[in-house]
């Protein structure tokens, strides 16, 4: 759950470091404020200064929409060239609800579980890979998006459509998670094929 303030952020950073020492990959939802988290701190995060990661085991996820066009990033998704690692489906995701029900939800908290699922798939087939390796496989094997998109949260009265930016400016990787490509890259790393 993304917040603007953390009374015990040092505890969270220690927990991240502990998870790293146990080779655990943490998949973190970037948040749903349509803002650049490179300039506006949100918690939890894996950086004390918005520049340097405290550990290489946290994968922060932005949400993509159902559209493969300028509306690809979800209009609510947080983004950041330094602090969001990759995007994943996060709009109208069919999920469970209490009392054995189902409903469609949107948010980076829907994008993070699909990414965690891909990470689990990679690690189940290739258990010798470290958390850090899996993180970088997901970031580097995703579908590269090479077109302009509407920057999330940029629509205004003066500019109802919003500001156009290259998708690659919204995350470290400029990519969308892709399970097949992740498995192929993992296989190449492990088996050298």
Q: Predicted regions span which residues?
A:
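Short acidic, glycine-rich surface-loop motifs adjacent to enzyme active sites
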Residues: 1-8, 29
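Short aromatic-enriched loop/helix-cap "lid" or pocket-rim segments at secondary-structure transitions
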Residues: 40-41, 72-75, 148-152
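Residue-level marker of structural boundaries
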Residues: 35, 102, 143-144
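Solvent-exposed, polar/charged alpha-helical surfaces in well-ordered, non-transmembrane soluble domains
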Residues: 10-21, 116, 120, 132, ...
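Short alpha-beta junction capping motif
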Residues: 19, 23, 27-29
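Glycine-rich, charge-decorated loop segments at or immediately adjacent to ligand/cofactor-binding or catalytic sites
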Residues: 28, 32-53
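C-terminal subdomain of the subtilisin-like protease fold in secreted/lumenal serine endopeptidases
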Residues: 57-60, 126-193
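Extracellular S/T/G-rich loop segment that most often corresponds to the catalytic His/Ser-adjacent loop
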Residues: 22-24, 46-124, 128, 132, ...
